[in-house]
């Protein structure tokens, strides 16, 4: 029953976020999230190195938005093409739903309504070949399995 309630909750959140899908996807916009082992979202790990590499190779070609727990921490790093936004705010949802590519290193919120014309790249923090992830877990609940079917 608990997993069914989570599933209904996720569907309600998807409906609430739907208006953001009315905005066009920006081909030059990249959104990044870096999960840091229970400490929140940070400018770190594999997504950070991809972000830095893209900025180095394609200077001023892309708008790069990082969804982080504390954007004030990165004020000194912000530039014309690099921005930090507080994660799980309306502003972060806007950038996530209008980016052509989203790069993350962990399982993103299962209720998040990514769009069909977006690319979601997951670098799987710490590798994945030796870890149980998502549906591979023996205790994967109903909501997790239902999301994987999508």
Q: Where are the model-predicted features located?
A:
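Active-site and donor-binding regions of nucleotide-sugar-utilizing enzymes
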Residues: 30-150
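Membrane-proximal basic amphipathic "stem/tether" segments
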Residues: 1-38
């Amino acid at each position: 029953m608990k997993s069914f309630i989570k599933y209904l909750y996720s569907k309600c959140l998807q409906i609430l976020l739907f208006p953001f899908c009315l905005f066009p996807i920006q081909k030059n916009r990249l959104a990044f999230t870096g999960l840091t082992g229970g400490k929140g979202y940070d400018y770190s790990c594999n997504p950070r190195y991809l972000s830095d590499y893209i900025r180095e190779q394609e200077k001023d070609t892309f708008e790069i938005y990082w969804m982080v727990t504390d954007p004030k921490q990165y004020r000194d790093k912000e530039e014309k093409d690099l921005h930090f936004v507080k994660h799980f705010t309306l502003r972060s949802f806007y950038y996530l739903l209008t980016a052509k590519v989203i790069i993350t290193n962990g399982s993103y919120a299962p209720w998040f309504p990514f769009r069909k014309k977006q690319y979601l790249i997951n670098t799987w923090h710490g590798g994945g070949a030796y870890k149980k992830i998502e549906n591979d877990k023996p205790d994967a609940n109903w909501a997790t399995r239902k999301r994987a079917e999508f």
